[in-house]
């Protein structure tokens, strides 16, 4: 799919539902990896996370900085002892973005979720993150809407 077609598709998604400001998919599902799929979220290097997160965005009025909050319910990283969580790594064809601001949620002593925060300190960081999310959303059948 061309970049302009992807931008048009996202423009439609943005204008369709203006009640929330989230990339999200309500149910956990299997992610089908297609040829050409280049986006991934990882907590352990080399282990793609298949649980699709809810993502909430905030941005300053002048656009100089912003924050993305990722909420993963029952992520794969807790299954089969895949390794220690060393951060959250957002990888696509442009490279990798990462954060170490990652917290596990526990209920009755068992891990049930992960919350991560990715801070964007410049407008260029924001634009780069949005390009990643557009690709990730396309690969995982997500939509975007503003609140």
From Swiss-Prot:
Transit peptide region: 1-34
This protein's GO CC annotations: chloroplast thylakoid membrane; photosystem II oxygen evolving complex
Keywords per UniProt: Chloroplast, Membrane, Photosynthesis, Photosystem II, Plastid, Thylakoid, Transit peptide
Membrane topology reported for the UniProt record: Peripheral membrane protein
Main location: plastid
Locations listed in the record: Plastid, Chloroplast thylakoid membrane
Highest taxon in the source lineage: Eukaryota
Record carries keyword Nucleotide-binding: no
InterPro entries recorded: Psb28_c1_sf, PSII_Psb28_class-1
Gene Ontology biological process terms, A to Z: photosynthesis
Signal peptide: none
Family: Belongs to the Psb28 family.
Subunit structure: Part of the photosystem II complex.
Protein name in UniProt: Photosystem II reaction center psb28 protein, chloroplastic
Organism (species): Ostreococcus tauri
Gene expressing this chain: psb28
């Amino acid at each position: 799919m061309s970049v302009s077609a992807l931008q048009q598709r996202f423009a439609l998604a943005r204008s369709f539902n203006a009640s929330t400001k989230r990339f999200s998919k309500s149910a956990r599902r299997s992610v089908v990896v297609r040829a050409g799929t280049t986006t991934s979220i990882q907590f352990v290097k080399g282990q793609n996370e298949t649980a699709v997160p809810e993502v909430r965005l905030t941005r300053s009025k002048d656009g100089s900085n912003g924050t993305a909050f990722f909420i993963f319910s029952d992520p794969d990283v807790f299954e089969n002892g895949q390794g220690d969580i060393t951060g959250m790594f957002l990888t696509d064809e442009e490279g990798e973005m990462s954060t170490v601001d990652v917290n596990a949620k526990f209920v009755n002593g068992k891990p049930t979720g992960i919350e991560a925060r990715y801070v964007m300190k410049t407008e260029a960081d924001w634009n780069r993150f949005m390009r990643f999310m557009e690709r990730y959303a396309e690969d995982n059948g997500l939509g975007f809407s503003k609140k």
